[in-house]
């Protein structure tokens, strides 16, 4: 805890929710910085365009870093990850990685959806801007809370994301389909449509080649 410093945010800028997350952080950062004058937030992400770098402000401690050469190094040296994700679907990789690397975070309900089940979150979940700022500051300063949040993250990974939890069922399913491939294909209506149109495209391409060769 004592060897870590600064906040981070990370995400590929080709993905719109990541850009909107950074815009939200820019909006919230001033209130965080007022309470933590020595702290900075480092924004990482590949494909950062000029509009992203325009948000860079060293005086405010809002630092656009661009692509991270080593995600492991970034996650192991930061103190808190901030992810006020406004929209999106599915498991958020940045939050799962924050758990794996022992980095507590503050995120939105969208960010945390479908991730922790009945386990306590590794930090805080809130959609309220004032509360987001309060929790970010609290998590940054309170060592006991920070360590408890770190432990929560490890438990979530252990109980919900370990490979061993899914591997046997996945392998069994693959074997089952392989042994009953024809039956599976007959029940896979969408797959049949895709297969049909794949063959049709090949059919008409071959006809086009035949006509071209006649000339």
List each language-model region with its residue ranges:
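Conserved catalytic-core segment of nucleotide-activated headgroup transferases in glycan assembly
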Residues: 1-72, 76
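Active-site donor-sugar recognition loop in glycosyltransferases
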Residues: 70, 87-90, 112
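Glycine-rich phosphate-binding loop at the start of an alpha helix
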Residues: 72, 92, 147
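Acidic donor-binding loop of glycosyltransferase active sites
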Residues: 76-90, 103
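Short hydrophobic beta-strand element within catalytic cores of glycosyltransferases
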Residues: 94-97, 104-108
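Short acidic/histidine- and often glycine-rich active-site loop of Leloir-type glycosyltransferases
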Residues: 109-120, 124-125
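Conserved acidic donor-binding segment of nucleotide-sugar-dependent glycosyltransferases
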Residues: 120-130, 138-143
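C-terminal amphipathic helix plus adjacent low-complexity
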Residues: 145-147, 154-215
